[in-house]
Design a protein with these regions (language model features):
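P-loop NTPase motor core
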Residues: 31, 107-184, 188, 341-428, ...
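Conserved P-loop NTPase
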Residues: 1-8, 111, 118-120, 193-251, ...
Length: 493
C-alpha cells in the first residue's frame, strides 16, 4: 500500500500544456512564467487565471511597473478565454502596484501583496512582472538580484501559507536559466520566440515542475484569437503504434492494384505514392477514400497546396468528395500557413480522426507539407514525419501519402533529396512516365510491402475520363523501362 499523498492539480486552460506538464498545475504551487518580450507570458498567465478563477477560488492579478490594468485588459479582452463577468462579480481583480514599487521598492510591494492576500484569501495569484520590480529598485539606487531572491523567498512563504496557486511573470533572456531566483519556484515554464527567415516560431519548455513527470524538450506553440496553445512533441512513436494483423487488408479502390499489393493494403499501414507531376497520385488517393466511403469507412484528406473549395473543384472526383463532405463521411483539412510545425499538423489530423471516426487518411502531398513548415522545422522533417506516421497508424488509420519527384531515370529514387523518407513508410507505389513508340505512357509498380509478398511487375495504366486509374497488363519483353526509353517489347521492336 502506498503512503503517498496525491497532489491535486488544476487545469491550465492552455490546450496541450497539461499534457506537457504531466498532469496540470499542482495546487498551491509557486510557478514562474519566463522568457523574452512578446513570447506570450502575460497571455498565458491570464488564460490560466480565467480558467481557474471561481467565486470559491478568487484570483488577484498584481501588475508592477509595467502596463496599468486598464491598458492590459484592453488587449486581453480580445481573446476567447477572457470572461468579463468574472471581473464584474469580483471573481477576478486587478491591482496595480506601480506607485508602491517606485516609493517603497520591494519591501513596500511585499507588504501590500501580503495585506491583500490576508484580506481576500485568493486561490490564484499572479504577479506581473517581478523582474520589472528589481529593475526599478536598481534604478533608484538600491536592490538587485540578491534582493530579488530574498523577495521571492518571502513571497513564496506568504503565498504558500495562504494556500494560493501562484504565477510570477518575468522577462528573461534565453540564456538566463541559472538565475538564483529559479530555485525558489516549484515550476518553471519558459517561452521562446524566434524569427527564422520570414517565419516567427514560438516554443515552450517546462524546465521543471516538482512532483510531476513533464515531457522534456521544446514544444511548438502558437498564439491565436483563442489564446495560447501548445502542441506536445511525441517522443517515442513506437509506443503508440498498434500491432495490426497483416491478414486484415483494405482495398485501394483500384482494380488490379490490390492484386499487385498482395491482396490490398494491410490495415494500419502507411503507403507512399511517388511520381512526377500529372502522373495520377491524387487520382489514386481519391479512389482510396471513395472506396472506403462505399464500405462505410470514413476518411480525412489533408491538403497543403490548394484551398478546400479549389481542391474540390479541380480534383477529378470532386463532386463525389463534396457529397461525402456533406454526409460527414469525409473531412478535408486545409493546412497551409508557412510557419506550421509537424506537431501542430499532427494534432489537427488526430482531432479530425477522432471527430469523425476516420480509418483512412490521405496526405496530399508531403512536398506541400514540407513547404508549409517553418524553415526551422524542415531540418527535422524526416524525424518529424516518422513521429506523425507512427501516431496516426497507432490510431488504426491506414495512410496514403503522396510525394512528387522529378522523373529522372538515372536512378530509382522514391523521394526527393535530401530527406530520403521512403524507408519511413510500410509500402511504396511508384508511378512513371515512359516513352514507347513515340507515345508518352504511364506505368506503375509496387516497390515494397513490408512483411508481405507483392507483385514484381511493372504495369501500364491509364487515367479515365471519369477520374479513375485503370491498371492494364504487365509491360513484358522490354528492357530499360525505368530509363524512360525502353527497347524491345512483345512485337520485338
Amino acid at each position: 500500500m502506498s503512503d503517498r499523498v496525491p497532489i491535486r492539480t488544476l487545469p491550465s486552460g492552455v490546450p496541450g500544456l497539461d499534457e506537457v506538464l504531466g498532469s496540470g498545475i499542482p495546487e498551491f504551487s509557486f510557478n514562474l512564467i519566463a522568457g523574452g518580450p512578446g513570447g506570450g507570458k502575460t497571455t498565458m498567465a491570464h488564460q490560466i487565471m480565467f480558467k481557474n478563477a471561481t467565486p470559491a477560488r478568487k484570483a488577484v492579478y498584481f501588475s508592477i511597473i509595467g502596463e496599468p490594468p486598464i491598458k492590459m485588459l484592453r488587449y486581453q479582452q480580445q481573446y476567447a478565454f477572457f470572461d468579463a463577468a468574472k471581473l464584474g462579480d469580483g471573481t477576478v481583480r486587478f491591482i496595480h502596484l506601480g506607485q508602491q514599487a517606485l516609493e517603497g521598492g520591494m519591501q513596500k510591494v511585499l507588504e501590500v501583496i501580503e495585506q491583500e492576500i490576508e484580506k481576500s484569501a485568493p486561490g490564484i495569484v499572479v504577479v506581473d512582472s517581478f523582474r520589472a520590480l528589481v529593475r526599478s529598485t536598481v534604478a533608484a539606487g538600491s536592490g538587485g538580484e540578491r534582493e530579488l531572491t530574498d523577495f521571492m523567498q518571502r513571497l513564496a512563504l506568504v503565498l504558500t501559507a495562504y494556500e494560493a496557486t501562484t504565477f510570477l511573470v518575468g522577462e528573461y533572456a534565453d540564456g538566463e536559466h541559472d538565475s538564483a531566483v529559479f530555485t525558489v519556484a516549484d515550476g518553471l515554464i519558459w517561452l521562446y520566440q524566434a524569427i527564422d527567415r520570414n517565419s516567427v516560431v514560438r516554443k515552450l519548455q517546462v524546465i521543471k515542475m516538482r512532483g510531476q513527470g513533464q515531457i522534456p524538450g521544446l514544444h511548438t506553440s502558437r498564439i491565436t484569437e483563442a489564446g495560447y496553445s501548445v502542441f506536445p512533441r511525441l517522443l517515442k512513436p513506437a509506443e503508440v503504434v498498434a500491432n495490426l494483423p497483416l491478414k486484415h487488408r483494405i482495398s485501394t479502390g483500384v482494380k488490379g492494384l490490390d492484386e499487385m499489393l498482395g491482396g490490398g493494403i494491410p490495415s494500419g499501414y502507411s503507403v507512399l505514392i511517388t511520381g512526377p507531376s500529372g502522373s495520377g497520385k491524387t487520382v489514386l488517393s481519391n479512389q482510396f477514400i471513395i472506396d472506403g466511403a462505399e464500405r462505410g469507412e470514413k476518411g480525412i484528406v489533408a491538403i497543403f497546396e490548394k484551398r478546400p473549395s479549389d481542391y474540390l473543384q479541380t480534383t477529378p472526383r470532386g463532386a463525389e468528395f463534396e457529397k461525402l463532405v456533406r454526409e460527414k463521411k469525409l473531412e478535408v483539412l486545409y493546412l497551409r500557413p508557412l510557419d506550421l510545425s509537424i506537431d501542430e499538423t499532427l494534432l489537427e489530423l488526430q482531432d479530425a480522426v477522432k471527430r469523425i471516426g476516420a480509418t483512412r487518411a490521405v496526405i496530399d502531398s508531403l512536398s506541400g507539407l514540407e513547404l508549409a513548415l517553418a524553415p526551422t522545422f524542415r531540418e527535422d522533417f524526416r524525424e518529424s514525419l516518422y513521429r506523425m506516421m507512427g501516431a496516426l497508424t497507432g490510431l488504426g488509420v491506414t495512410i496514403i501519402a503522396t510525394v512528387e519527384v522529378a522523373d529522372s531515370y538515372i536512378d530509382l529514387r522514391f523521394s526527393p533529396e535530401p530527406h530520403g523518407i521512403a524507408f519511413l513508410t510500410d509500402a511504396i507505389i511508384i508511378q512513371r512516365y515512359l516513352e514507347i513508340e513515340g507515345q508518352l505512357r504511364r506505368a506503375l509498380a509496387v516497390v515494397k510491402v513490408r512483411s508481405s509478398q507483392h507483385s514484381k511487375d511493372l504495369k501500364e495504366y491509364e487515367i479515365s475520363t471519369e477520374g479513375g486509374i485503370i491498371v492494364g497488363q504487365p509491360l513484358t519483353g522490354y528492357e530499360g523501362l525505368l530509363t524512360g526509353t525502353p527497347k524491345g517489347g512483345e512485337n520485338g521492336k
